[in-house]
Each structure stands twice: as C-alpha cells, then as structure tokens.
Amino acid sequence: RMKEEPLPDTPLGRAGVDPVMIERFRKFTHLMEKYGLKLIVGIVTGWMSGRMHKPHAFQGLNVLSDPFAIRWEVRFVRAFVRELRNEPAIVAWDLGNECNCMAVKTSHEMWNWSNAISSAIRLEDSSRPIVSGMHGLKLEDEHNCSAMLADQAETTDVLCTHPYQRFTAHCLIDPVNTLRNAFHAAVETRLYEEVGGVPAFVEEAGSLGPAYSSETVAAHYLG
C-alpha cells in the first residue's frame, strides 16, 4: 500500500514507488545541475547514523537475504533508475549507504544481494559506473563477514572507503588529529585499489563530531 491506498497499476506503482517522491528527487537533480554540482546517488539506503530504517512490509525480514525483500528492492531500483537515468547531474549510481550494516549475513548472501542490485541498475542504465557504498570491507572471509573486498570489486565498478578510525580494526590507537590517522584514508583507499583491481575513492571522512573530538581538534584533523 502507498499511504492508505492500494498500489496503483502503473509502472511506478507496481514497483512500490511514489511518483511524487520521484518528481521531488528530479527537481533536486535539476537544482544540482543549475548550480554546477554532480550527484552519486545511493539508491538502497536503510542504514543512516547507526539506525536502520525500512518499510513496514520488511519488518522482521533480513533485507539482504530474504527473497521477498530482494524482489521488491530490485523492483524499486529498476523503477528509480529508469525514471532518473536521463538526468545529467547524476554521474554514478551507488548501491546505498553502508548497506553491509543493514543486516547480519554471510559473504555469500552479501555477494548475492550486491549482484542483484548491481544487475538491476545495469538493466536500466549501463552508461554510468556503480559505486559500492560499503563500509569496512574485509580481505578474508570471517564469521558474519560484513562484505568481502574482492566480492564488491567483482559486482561493482568503483570501491569506496569510509575511513573512521573508531570503526576500523587496529586504527583506534592515536588521537584523531595525529600523523598516523592522517594517512588512514589514503592508505585504506590505496589498499582497496590494489587488492580489488578497480578504482577507489574516499566517500566519507570526518571526526564523528564532538563525542570524539572538539571543534578545534576536528578542524586540525580535516585541515
């Protein structure tokens, strides 16, 4: 259902997509184009700032492995990309913000999800690269592995790093504004490129706000 009404029998309705929201996003892309900005669009974004957001229909489901959830995610992704693929402000598609944090899964389930979403994007738009969008990729398969670096390099076109020392193994050693941490982003991104064999870039970086560092320390780190 969309609000309190059944899904309309339209291409967007059959994908569970509200046309009003599509037009709002389209207007947003036009504003970006007007002011000379470009967009990397994270499509499946349920995980934000340590909290999980998902539709009521997905409550109790593992959104990375449940076939019902993946079916509707693929429908949504195809409809979203199909509607917006002609917007020049969009330079790349991103699977979504740190989707490997959305649920517990095996590396096999994560590969299957990533491949399904990437394939859905490519069915509608093969002209733009697909960015992984994940956080903390693993080099080796571990118990409840978040996501394998090699698997993301296989299923997407571009890898990205979110180099927060607090959430990276063996990196919470020095103060945020010291020399070793200053090289964290560059070293991790270079590692992704060398191991994955695809381009990589720093997608997020920062000091995690006043809970971890003062404004003075944060300015020193980012400056």
Model-predicted regions and their roles:
Residues 1-163, 167-170, 176, 180-182, ...:
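Active-site mouth of glycoside hydrolases
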Residues 198:
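Short glycine/Trp-rich loop-beta-loop segment that forms part of the substrate-binding cleft
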Residues 221-223:
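Active-site-adjacent alpha-helix of alpha/beta-hydrolase-fold enzymes
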